[in-house]
Amino acid sequence: MNTTSAVLLLVGLFAVIFTLSVPIGIYMSAVFDGTLSQKFPWMYRVESIFLWPLGKSGREPMDWKEYCVSLIALTVVGTVIGYLIFRFQGYLPYNPLNFKGLAPDLAFNTAVSFSTSTTWQGYDCENVMSLFSQAFGVCTLTFLSSSTGVVAAFAFARGLIQSRDPSLGNAWEDMVRCVLWLFLPLAVICSIIAVWQGCTQTFDAMTVVKTIEGPIQKIAVGPVASQEVIRVLAVTGGGFFSANSAHPFAAPTAVVCMIQIILMLLMAASLVFAYGRMTGNVKSGFSILFGMMVLFIGAFMLIAWSESTANPLVTELGVSHGLGNMEGKEVRFGTLLTSLFATGSSASAAGSSAGSFDSMMPIGGGVSLWLIQVGDVIFGGSRSGLYTMLGLAIVAVFILGMLVGKTPRYLGKRIDAYDMKMVCVSLLMPSICTLIGTAIACLTPQGVDAVSAPGPHGFTQILFAFSSVSNFNGSSFGGLAANDFFYNTALAICMWICRMVTLTALLAIAGNMASKPRQMNSVQAIQTDGPVFSFMFIMVAVLLSMITFFPAQSLGPIVESIQLFWGYHS
């Protein structure tokens, strides 16, 4: 690995992210606290057009139960509409290739995937999805489901700043503001840049070209740029093509690839800054952001080092390994940029890919898997990233309080037993679904038959799939043939349970916090804006994930690495 190139790449990446996250964070806080709508009355009137069908309930404050029910109801409606679109796409317009409707189990899995913002894709995207399904099914659900995660994060922040006021805002108002004033403007701007760089944006289904050898080739096209931008901006990852960002029409240049990496991390950084402004403690937000950055850099260096290492089985064949492990990677990106993309995708729960996770070296694949298993925490973005991070922050404050004998308070709110129970529920549910789902798959013929390689690599394929859907990531080891009734059903159940349980538990914490008095500057308070808190935040994230998943990782990537470097070359 070229260390200088890696360091310069990281410095440039974070310089751009921090430069952009401050103004975007200020803008986001103005959007969600209503300042922008008050300053520009026309924006309020536009919002009212979309909220008109709801009447007064579109503006009235909600407690946590009403807020939660509204978001769950939207998710249910999105799932039903998505299922109908995917199931009956053969009868809908914009289907020039006459694709039939998806099978019931696949349509169910896909609808749940995009309505919960997981965007797991167990199908060959451009070869089974009509343009209508891509543009009006996949893309629309991406906007709505991602907005659900953002508004839930701001509802959590309101719970921390309210004092004896159970209101968390209005879910419908927040959703409209998120889509209209946050995602749509950014998506339009970035889509124009993507088209300029070579991404396709058309309602033609394919383009016919004559190859150098002479035969005619049909290449799938469509409204790619608009979908590719929102999937990375909203940190969902559901691509137009099966190859995702490795496809030359999705990321035609290294510039587009780098922009996609920036967008994956930008929303998370902006959310943290906006959270700090809303709570009146920007330093606390930066403490969390610093912890996220440390974990990200460490993971990237491990993955980049692993992928710069030659595969010993390939070296034995006399193949030059000067470029590192190039299997499953695009030459236009190389190992370094692909490693950075994989780190950003796994850490931010974007689920995108610019190369094959299945072809990574065991350490690289294992670190990517661990980033997913940490739980949408490191630059978690618009899915459940911010409110999951705040859940970990509450755990860190609680542990610090126990260590020093102080009352655990976070931003002036006392942390009680109810808060800790709900945090435990939200943090443990994805782990439970991951491990139980993996165990069931390994014990059933349907689960085992889907793997492409026996032994530890096949186990990693299964573990990666259930880790991905339970933590709202959506990426996968491509060698797992997951488009069957068993995996479509099992993975959809995991996605649904984890989304509903974590969302409900963390909004319950927000409601409980909102009803408490806020006592700032208490002598019993623990500082949450310094290096000690950042260190504890990092330790909690690392230790919780390692304690939970190290045994499973030992059976997969760790054993595979030992076999690869020592087992065959002892």
What spans do the regions from the language model cover?
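Membrane-proximal intracellular helices of multi-pass ion channels
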Residues: 2-570
